[in-house]
Amino acid sequence: MIELQFTKMHGAGNDFVFVDCLKNDIGNLAAIAKKLCDRRFGVGADQLLTVHPSEVADFKMEIYNADGSQVEMCGNGIRCFAKYVCDHGLTKKKELEVETLAGIIRPRLVGDLVEVDMGEPILEGRKIPVEADGQIADRLL
């Protein structure tokens, strides 16, 4: 069993476990996410977010769901990520560049809050990317 320091945060109803991987390789992050995020036998969280060095931005953020699958981005997660790196003294910047699987995201700290431009929302059902086993309905119920 390894000893692992972590921080738990929440944003708008989503909760996250954060692990700093800037200096340490902690192993299989998908397996760690499954254990830490388990609400019955672990810490319990929606996602594991990890902080890594980046060659193209201030930091790199990796996100793992509770089932161990990796995802591109999470709006509430990036806000908590920005707060985490600032609160833990990893940066003094108020405007950050964070590398994600969805590209570079630029959160901005404004007082105790974090703003993120997530781009234009996709509101048209046929344009929203979906993977499903079965027919996809394109109507409001």
Model-derived features: positions:
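A glycine-rich beta-to-alpha transition motif near the start of alpha/beta enzyme domains, typified by
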Residues: 1-111
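ATP-dependent small-molecule kinase catalytic core of the GHMP/sugar-kinase superfamily
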Residues: 90, 99-141
